[in-house]
């Protein structure tokens, strides 16, 4: 017995001590992989800055984005007084771009959130129950996929009427099938796993299996796709506003600003350049952030 205890103590003494700060949780592993991606980190910082600017835009903007008019500097280019210049009505473009970030970002995020919520629910039902549920939901998705996203959004806005709220609904509708297919595919794979069969064998209800076991397994894919989809939604919302179907003047939405700038693009190109640059940088940042999240959450994809 003493010999056994002596050997046991020797083994315990030989084992390295693991300090609490050396234990790597999934979050630590994710952060370790993500911070190595410099482009994704830069994009994340830009997105955070954009969100802060969007929240406090009306306090940060040096001039009123809708009711300030400088009639002495119509269509003047960038200057110390007006960093991005002035449009044909004397409005400060820098202030309008800042406030436009609030509107464009909100439209993109809310549209994707609605599409993700409905699409995730439909994808879970289609993948888990299969049968006629699967066939019905996927046929509806096929019909929606048959139309280009922007064309479908135009059709929806034509029925509902113009306005930023209807643009959000329109963009959300063509986001639904994309999320539904993504979640359905993940659900079909997860439902075959042993832990799902174990949960069923102990009497877990379908709702419990879906919400406690399958849905968490799809979260990483949803987060990545959600992030990248925001850029698409911002472009779609701006396109609808550019066509006169979205935000209406004098609302400082980026697409609406481009619509107003069309008549002056030759004599005052800066009126269109800065809204375009804002859209480009925002969409690029969300796409790079989505790529970084994908590689950090599932490094096997990168390999």
Swiss-Prot record:
It is found in: Cell inner membrane. One of its GO terms (molecular function) is dipeptide transmembrane transporter activity. The keyword Ion transport does not apply. It comes from the Bacteria. The chain crosses the membrane at residues 40-60, 105-125, 144-164, 165-185, 222-242, 266-286. Gene3D superfamilies: MetI-like. Disulfide bonds: none annotated. Pfam families: BPD_transp_1, OppC_N. The keyword Magnesium does not apply. Residues 101-290 form the ABC transmembrane type-1 domain. Its main location: membrane. It is a multi-pass membrane protein. PROSITE patterns: ABC_TM1. Keywords: Cell inner membrane, Cell membrane, Membrane, Transmembrane, Transmembrane helix, Transport. One of its GO terms (cellular component) is plasma membrane. PANTHER family: GLUTATHIONE TRANSPORT SYSTEM PERMEASE PROTEIN GSID (PTHR43386:SF3), OLIGOPEPTIDE TRANSPORT SYSTEM PERMEASE PROTEIN APPC (PTHR43386). NCBIfam families: PRK15082.1. The complex is composed of two ATP-binding proteins (GsiA), two transmembrane proteins (GsiC and GsiD) and a solute-binding protein (GsiB). Belongs to the binding-protein-dependent transport system permease family. Part of the ABC transporter complex GsiABCD involved in glutathione import. Probably responsible for the translocation of the substrate across the membrane. This is Glutathione transport system permease protein GsiD. It comes from Shigella dysenteriae serotype 1 (strain Sd197).
């Amino acid at each position: 017995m003493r010999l056994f205890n002596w050997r046991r103590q020797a083994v315990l003494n030989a084992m390295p001590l693991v300090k609490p700060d050396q234990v790597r949780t999934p979050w630590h592993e994710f952060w370790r992989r993500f911070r190595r991606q410099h482009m994704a980190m830069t994009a994340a910082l830009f997105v955070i800055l954009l969100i802060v600017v969007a929240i406090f835009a009306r306090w940060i903007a040096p001039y009123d984005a809708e009711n300030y008019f400088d009639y002495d500097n119509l269509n003047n280019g960038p200057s110390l007084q007006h960093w991005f210049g002035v449009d044909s009505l004397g409005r400060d473009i820098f202030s309008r771009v800042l406030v436009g970030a609030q509107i464009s970002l909100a439209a993109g995020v809310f549209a994707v959130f609605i599409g993700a919520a409905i699409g995730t629910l439909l994808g879970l039902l289609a993948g888990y129950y299969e049968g006629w549920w699967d066939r019905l939901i996927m046929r509806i998705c096929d019909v929606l996929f048959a139309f280009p996203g922007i064309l479908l959004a135009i059709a929806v806005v034509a029925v509902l009427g113009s306005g930023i709220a209807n643009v959000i609904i329109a963009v959300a509708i063509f986001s639904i099938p994309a999320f539904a297919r993504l979640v359905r595919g993940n659900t079909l794979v997860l439902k075959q796993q042993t832990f799902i069969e174990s949960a069923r064998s102990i009497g877990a209800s379908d709702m419990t299996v879906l919400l406690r076991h399958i849905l968490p397994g799809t979260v990483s894919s949803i987060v990545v796709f959600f992030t990248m989809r925001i850029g698409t939604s911002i472009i779609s919302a701006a396109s609808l506003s550019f066509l006169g179907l979205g935000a209406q003047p004098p609302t400082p939405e980026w697409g609406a600003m481009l619509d107003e700038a069309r008549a002056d693009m030759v004599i005052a190109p800066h009126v269109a350049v800065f809204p375009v640059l804002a859209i480009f940088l925002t969409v690029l940042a969300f796409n790079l952030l989505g790529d970084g999240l994908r590689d950090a959450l599932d490094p096997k994809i990168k390999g």
